[in-house]
């Protein structure tokens, strides 16, 4: 069992899953977001769950038994090369990628910062960039990919997405809005690096009562001559 922080629901709300859609949760363990997708779609989404760490799959199986939510496929592929393993495309993809976890740190609890280092952040940035490139290849034209982390680091959020946008001209960001005082838009720059201005449509959640730090960005694979709107979270 685990308690899911309120911030963890935001990536799924940004994904806006619908019944009968083919949806990939690329880093699914322990299954909290997957079960929320199933709940919002009344167990009618065609869910493919994947996690690159085999030992974490057991958590998904246990949660499925507890909550009785449905999925079609469960796999154990490294997300950085998942496009080489899955021979199909999806309407929507959730990429809640592994990160340094800065959003869960508590200065009153030094143990939460035990494993943090700048080198670790830079390592994750490289892996996140590869994961984003790989999963986007599995997205249908017109489809939506939501990228999320539980860290503040621009190196793991705006930076890999900004680099990704330079090399994927068929990708665009759809603005997200959430009317909470602890929510900010994406950063414009970091150090000497200026981000793609569209990243101001991403959301940064600052820690507050009941909410950990989080980053959420909604990416669309464009189809010619079509226009798309952003998403207001927490509203019908």
Protein language model regions, located:
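S-adenosylmethionine
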Residues: 1-236
């Amino acid at each position: 069992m685990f308690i899911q922080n309120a911030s963890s629901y935001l990536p799924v709300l940004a994904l806006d899953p619908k019944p009968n859609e083919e949806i990939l949760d690329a880093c699914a363990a322990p299954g909290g977001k997957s079960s929320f997708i199933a709940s919002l779609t009344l167990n009618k989404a065609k869910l493919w769950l994947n996690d690159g760490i085999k030992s974490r799959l057991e958590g998904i199986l246990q949660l499925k038994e507890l909550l009785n939510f449905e999925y079609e496929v469960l796999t154990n592929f490294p997300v950085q090369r998942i496009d080489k393993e899955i021979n199909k495309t999806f309407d929507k993809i959730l990429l809640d990628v592994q990160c340094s976890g800065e959003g869960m740190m508590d200065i009153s609890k030094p143990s939460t910062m035990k494993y943090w280092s700048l080198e670790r952040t830079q390592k994750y940035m490289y892996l996140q960039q590869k994961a984003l490139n790989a999963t986007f290849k599995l997205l249908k034209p017109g489809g939506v990919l939501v990228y999320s982390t539980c860290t503040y680091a621009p190196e793991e959020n705006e930076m890999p997405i900004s680099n990704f946008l330079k090399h994927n001209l068929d990708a665009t960001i759809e603005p997200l809005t959430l009317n909470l005082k602890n929510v900010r838009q994406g950063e414009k720059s970091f150090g000497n690096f200026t981000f793609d201005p569209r990243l101001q449509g991403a959301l940064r959640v600052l820690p507050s009562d009941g909410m950990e730090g989080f980053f959420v960005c909604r990416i669309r694979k464009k189809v010619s001559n079509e226009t798309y709107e952003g998403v207001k979270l927490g509203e019908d």
